[in-house]
């Protein structure tokens, strides 16, 4: 941390920032706890996806709540954070040095000049500014009285070719109480800086716009820039600084060149408490609006998810109601001749008679085959469901689910079939196989008719109803799994926390214009 002994900023008569409101806090109560819950609730929201984008950058909003709102609610005496931001070559660092009256931030022709944020801070406030929004700052301490009311921060270029520099600059803008937006006659119309400018203003941050390096040849830029600011709803208050040809070793402009900006900052510093309250009020209102919009979007998304789940569940349930699995026991026993006499039926019964020790292995094979058939049919039904998103990943998820979900219900159903069959001695296997075939295919087979007689229809209906019910339970689980895949993490969202925090933000603060 560097120690700066530059000249104090003069105590000139202040000029209030153009969009400042005078506010009072009506009640804070447990707003800190509500904000912490809001940050946690925002953390619970899954990342936006192409299928359901959010209008708000949720991660950025969570950081703003945690790193901007909370510290200011808990410590209303902290100095204002004044961030100098702008495009490449706008002269931010030179301007900050000139305001400070000392060499705070490096300048030069090599771009980018400012690679890490530099904060000019009063020594007693240094700990509060080692990090801003999670971004580590290089600290330079100074003794100017204004630093008791505000910290001045130089940032990397908002349009830097290095992604990390842009992210750092945008993060600092998101955590500023005041943004001094510096651009030049050559760069004032560039698209990227305007995006940052609009976002800062949208979140309720005070913005001081500075058009640097004005010359007679570029005088038209001042008029055009002011027109653009007005059209964008940013007002027409524009500070201008003329072009100065500095010596190569010079890092500062003459004091007269930055007099209007220095005067503006001194004026804000003289009413720091009111300005901080006004800014906090506006950022709170903007945050409440963002959270409200986010709640609406998530509620709509949950509604879409529920509709998706209900439609998929209904379709699977309907398909399973009419499921027809054929040939479940093929090869396990000799089939009944199509046109047989009593003699042939007797022969068929004798040939399919199994000793008690032979039955368990047959039942195991039957369970494996039925499990395989059920998994295949369920997979076919799901793959035929057209609205299913993320089809590639879905197949793996469904296969994994079915591998664990099917075997146990199938085995339990086969045990149920054995219990209700009540076969005559020696006919246990024949009865089980006939009842399984009939229930799976949805029709009473000839074998079941022979074995169960007048009771065949009722037994088959009972077995089938039990089978379909178990399959529908599996189908419901598959539908839930596919829904989770289509809308990952949505079930973990603390929607009630979002609603509660939103209500607190709306009701706990009041704006009183003086």
Put a short name on every predicted segment:
Residues 1-21:
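N-terminal amphipathic/basic-hydrophobic helices that include classical n-h-c signal peptides
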Residues 137-147, 167-179, 183-237:
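Conserved C-terminal guanine-recognition region of P-loop GTPase G domains, centered on the G4
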Residues 146-163:
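Switch II (G3) loop of P-loop NTPases
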Residues 23-149:
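Conserved G1/Walker A P-loop phosphate-binding module
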Residues 125-126, 157-159, 186-188, 214-217, ...:
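Conserved nucleotide-binding/hydrolysis micro-motifs of P-loop NTPases
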Residues 61-65, 160-165, 188-192:
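Short secondary-structure boundary/capping elements
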Residues 18-78, 254-257, 262-513:
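Extended helical scaffolds that flank P-loop GTPase cores
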Residues 215-275:
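Canonical P-loop GTPase G-domain recognition
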């Amino acid at each position: 941390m560097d120690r700066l002994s530059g000249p104090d900023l003069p105590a000139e008569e202040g000029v209030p920032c153009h969009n400042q409101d005078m506010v009072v806090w009506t009640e804070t109560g447990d707003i800190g706890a509500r904000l912490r819950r809001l940050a946690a609730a925002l953390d619970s929201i899954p990342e936006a996806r192409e299928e359901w984008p959010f209008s708000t950058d949720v991660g950025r909003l969570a950081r703003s709540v945690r790193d901007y709102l909370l510290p200011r609610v808990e410590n209303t005496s902290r100095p204002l954070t004044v961030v100098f931001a702008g495009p490449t070559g706008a002269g931010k660092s030179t301007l900050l040095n000139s305001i400070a009256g000392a060499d705070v931030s490096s300048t030069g022709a090599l771009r980018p000049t400012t690679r890490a944020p530099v904060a000019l801070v009063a020594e007693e406030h240094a700990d509060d500014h080692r990090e801003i929004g999670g971004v580590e700052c290089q600290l330079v301490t100074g003794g100017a009285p204004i630093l008791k009311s505000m910290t001045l921060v130089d940032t990397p270029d908002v349009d830097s070719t290095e992604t990390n520099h842009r992210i750092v600059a945008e993060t600092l803008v998101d955590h500023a109480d005041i943004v001094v937006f510096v651009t030049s006659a050559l760069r004032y119309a560039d698209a990227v800086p305007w995006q940052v400018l609009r976002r800062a203003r949208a979140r309720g941050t005070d913005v001081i716009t500075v058009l640097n390096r004005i010359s007679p040849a570029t005088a038209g830029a001042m008029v055009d820039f002011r027109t653009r600011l007005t059209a964008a709803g940013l007002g027409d208050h524009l500070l201008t600084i003329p072009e100065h040809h500095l010596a190569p070793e010079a890092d500062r402009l003459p004091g007269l060149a930055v007099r209007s900006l220095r005067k503006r900052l001194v004026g804000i510093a003289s009413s720091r408490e009111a300005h901080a309250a006004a800014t906090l009020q506006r950022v709170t209102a903007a945050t409440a609006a963002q959270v409200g919009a986010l709640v609406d979007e998530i509620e709509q998304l949950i509604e879409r998810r529920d509709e998706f789940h209900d439609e998929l569940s209904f379709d699977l349930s309907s398909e399973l109601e009419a499921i027809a699995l054929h040939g479940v026991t093929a090869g396990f026993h000799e089939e009944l001749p199509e046109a047989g006499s009593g003699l042939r039926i007797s022969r068929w019964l004798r040939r399919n008679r199994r000793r008690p020790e032979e039955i368990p292995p047959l039942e195991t094979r039957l369970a494996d085959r039925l499990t395989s058939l059920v998994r295949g049919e369920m997979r076919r039904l799901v793959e035929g469901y057209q609205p299913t998103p993320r089809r590639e990943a879905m197949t793996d998820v469904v296969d994994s689910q079915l591998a664990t979900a099917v075997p146990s219900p199938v085995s339990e159903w086969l045990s149920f079939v054995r219990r209700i069959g009540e076969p005559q001695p020696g006919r246990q296997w024949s009865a089980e196989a006939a009842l399984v075939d009939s229930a799976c295919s949805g029709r009473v087979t000839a074998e079941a008719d022979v074995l169960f007689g007048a009771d065949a229809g009722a037994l088959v209906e009972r077995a089938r109803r039990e089978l379909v019910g178990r399959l529908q339970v599996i189908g419901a689980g598959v539908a839930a799994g596919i829904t989770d895949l289509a809308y990952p993490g949505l079930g973990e969202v603390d929607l009630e926390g979002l609603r509660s925090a939103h209500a607190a933000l709306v009701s706990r603060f009041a704006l009183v214009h003086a």
